[in-house]
From Swiss-Prot:
Toxin that inhibits voltage-gated potassium channel currents in DRG neurons (IC(50)=about 570 nM). In vivo, induces neurotoxicity shown by twitching, paralysis, and body contraction. In vivo, insects injected with this toxin showed signs of neurotoxicity including twitching, paralysis, and body contraction. Residues 20-41 form a propeptide. This is Kappa-scoloptoxin(07)-Ssm2a. It comes from Scolopendra mutilans. Belongs to the scoloptoxin-07 family. Contains 3 disulfide bonds. Keywords: Cleavage on pair of basic residues, Disulfide bond, Ion channel impairing toxin, Neurotoxin, Potassium channel impairing toxin, Secreted, Signal, Toxin, Voltage-gated potassium channel impairing toxin. Residues 1-19 form the signal peptide. GO terms for cellular component: extracellular region.
Amino acid sequence: MLVFYALLFVTVFSNTVMGATIDKPIPKPILREAIEEIEVNKRAQNHYCKEHNCPPGKHCPKVPIACVYGPCCF
């Protein structure tokens, strides 16, 4: 009976204490998806060139670019 309790204690102790103290690494696909999602959110927040912001006679470039300062029309 004492052996049973000893095994039970070792099992519970190793699962709770050791499992709580040793952090498992984040799987690479999940980490990669999180980084891609952050990049997409950053791009969505950028202010791309919009035709209605351009002064008369100037237009946005054909390739969409993010405007840091001003409407960036050419």
